[in-house]
Regions:
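Class II aminoacyl-tRNA synthetase catalytic cores and aaRS-like
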Residues: 1-222
């Protein structure tokens, strides 16, 4: 097997959770997660299910898949069905098309204006012929389903090269996190580490914003 990188890239914990939904990303997988919550504030987007969820604190994240316009409907429906089997409400999807004018083909395509589609293309680095899979939910559950979906879609599209080792460093872990069940704040990973920055200011800071001198090495998602 060969190394994907001569120098292992450094990825902050925050970036890893946004782009890969996990602090153990498999970088052999080229798919990236993007946050497109902002698009749903547009008046020319009428997908009301997501709009209502966003008002109650949910986010929208999506995965763009390259040149999947010729995939059969069953490819998309099977991924949506799979997401529901994981406990999610499913994955909404559409494909960018241009028959003289930009449009979106798929069950939810009609809810987006041409201008809104252009904004999504820009945010996701997508082109005509690419497809978008999107999910909406509270951050923790959203990260989980998009991370799983990223792996699932890559497997279905045969995007993973098994002959590569893709190492990376994950850095800048949060010192603390909030427990979803108790709503209390506790140590997120390793309590026996130093917080970053000037310690004299830490009492005044929101503990959830404090980063720790913690790091981890990841290879192929492990």
């Amino acid at each position: 097997k060969k190394l994907m990188y001569d120098q292992f890239p450094k990825i902050s914990y925050a970036d890893a959770m946004l782009k890969y939904g996990s602090d153990k990303p498999d970088l052999r997988n080229p798919l990236v997660i993007n946050d497109i919550t902002e698009v749903f504030s547009r008046e020319d987007v009428s997908f009301e299910i997501f709009k209502k969820l966003i008002k109650s604190g949910s986010k929208v994240r999506c995965i763009s898949t390259k040149n999947t316009k010729d995939k059969p409907r069953s490819f998309f429906d099977n991924i949506d069905k799979w997401a529901k089997e994981q406990g999610a409400s499913g994955l909404a999807y559409f494909t960018f098309e241009d028959d003289g004018e930009l449009s979106a083909k798929g069950p939810i395509g009609k809810f987006f204006s041409k201008e809104a589609l252009v904004e999504i293309m820009e945010k996701t680095n997508s082109e005509v012929g690419d497809s978008i899979f999107m999910a909406c939910g509270k951050l923790n559950e959203l990260e989980k389903i998009t991370a799983l979906a990223r792996d699932k879609i890559a497997q279905d599209l045969d995007l993973i090269d098994d002959n590569i080792f893709a190492f990376c460093w994950i850095v800048d872990y949060p010192m603390f996190e909030r427990d979803e069940t108790t709503n209390k704040i506790g140590f997120s990973h390793n309590p026996f580490s130093m917080p970053q920055g000037d310690l004299t200011d830490k009492e005044l800071e929101d503990p959830l914003n404090i980063l720790a001198y913690q790091y981890d090495i990841v290879c192929n998602g492990i």
